[in-house]
Amino acid sequence: MSVSAFNRRWAAVILEALTRHGVRHICIAPGSRSTPLTLAAAENSAFIHHTHFDERGLGHLALGLAKVSKQPVAVIVTSGTAVANLYPALIEAGLTGEKLILLTADRPPELIDCGANQAIRQPGMFASHPTHSISLPRPTQDIPARWLVSTIDHALGTLHAGGVHINCPFAEPLYGEMDDTGLSWQQRLGDWWQDDKPWLREAPRLESEKQRDWFFWRQKRGVVVAGRMSAEEGKKVALWAQTLGWPLIGDVLSQTGQPLPCADLWLGNAKATSELQQTQIVVQLGSSLTGKRLLQWQASCEPEEYWIVDDIEGRLDPAHHRGRRLIANIADWLELHPAEKRQPWCVEIPRLAEQAMQAVIARRDAFGEAQLAHRISDYLPEQGQLFVGNSLVVRLIDALSQLPAGYPVYSNRGASGIDGLLSTAAGVQRASGKPTLAIVGDLSALYDLNALALLRQVSAPLVLIVVNNNGGQIFSLLPTPKNERERFYLMPQNVHFEHAAAMFELKYHRPQNWQELETALVDAWRTPTTTVIEMVVNDTDGAQTLQQLLAQVSHL
């Protein structure tokens, strides 16, 4: 009996089972213990293969692929700390709803807790973060193939969002020629091998039903809060809110066109909050809100009803409102709850939104990150997409820009970490094949610098704008101790990215003004390669501009 041959047959069943649940993209890191999984993936023509040498980046690459494809994405890594590097991407997927399937190779049980090399306690290591965790036994013909495939099917068939961790121990030898070992074991699955359906099919999840009192609530004074959603959903939500005559407060990830722009500015005005006190019902569609003033208003508002509609399960309401948590696809929910044409009930807020935008426009000429945030809609590629980093940059875009309705916007706003942003952007571009504009800060770029290797392989133009404000300037917006702020919070690194781009043979520009930036962008959109544009700005101007605008708009 060949151990290596049966390892591969066991792995082949696992990988084939994944294809029955829509898995097409598979991300593979180098490793020896994962050889059975890697070879099974390589031999399966249903997969699109992606490779990367850094498991943390690989997990985020898978996250980006899943964001766009809306399908589960598989990841294969070897044993040991390679597995732990998948933790950040798994956490993010659990909070934002992407489906990741982590296939982690492991040592067999007799090599755990005895000093064996690269052997750690992998089962359960991700605690409560996976939606499902499966600890497979070592491959053996004593366990029927139908148990293995139905175990995979059960986990994936009931997976609505988040990650599945499948721990796969393999004994040595891992290498060798294939023979007939385990062939009859494998063939007992019969015509499943020629089929394209799961062995075990789970009943679909039930979504929230139509709210029978909607006809009553839609006649009230309502507010629509739009969080993260798809581009198509964003357009539908904007039309729905307009028909109802309800003000729509749109997050940067809502893709609604933000008909009342600069909400994070005008929500700091007492006239706006006073008018919003008349709200009888808030309908929040989507989660992961960005703006500080929006979150403050959300926490303090006291409508008669607060409804949250999102496809993701869980509470999704840090303010713990009295109301309804409705688990449903947003577009489907809108169909079940049609709008009734009514006149807008807010008077002050549209005026304040217009005045706030004019205040931003009046400051647009200076070459800085706040101005870039406002101008970003002018720089979006046609038929393309935007990926927004975390920390200060996403807050500036949320507060100062007005993105077009239905234009795809992606970000990692679940746990809102700055790790893996370049890798996620790479996955977003690969899955869509669209021209992509990505914008991150300098610390975010440094954190995921080796992901520039992934950006060498793009199918359409990708522009990475690195806003270099020399540190974590978001802490300038917080009451951090002044004497300790620079060393312990901002942590300026005094670096530039020209040599990093050169190392990975990427085009690089460092514009000094808007004309040079726009010229670099025109050139970048012409060829299907990656261009790094480093925008060096004054350290504190972005945060100061936001604070000045907040003060100005609060007194309108």
From Swiss-Prot:
Signal peptide as annotated in the record: none
UniProt keyword annotation of Transferase present: yes
GO BP, sorted A to Z: menaquinone biosynthetic process
Catalyzed chemical reaction(s): isochorismate + 2-oxoglutarate + H(+) = 5-enolpyruvoyl-6-hydroxy-2-succinyl-cyclohex-3-ene-1-carboxylate + CO2
Pathway participation: Quinol/quinone metabolism; 1,4-dihydroxy-2-naphthoate biosynthesis; 1,4-dihydroxy-2-naphthoate from chorismate: step 2/7; Quinol/quinone metabolism; menaquinone biosynthesis
Its EC number(s): 2.2.1.9
Cofactor(s), names only, from the UniProt record: Mg(2+); Mn(2+); thiamine diphosphate
Enzyme class: transferase
Domain of life: Bacteria
Subunit structure: Homodimer.
Protein's UniProt name: 2-succinyl-5-enolpyruvyl-6-hydroxy-3-cyclohexene-1-carboxylate synthase
The species this protein was found in: Escherichia coli O7:K1 (strain IAI39 / ExPEC)
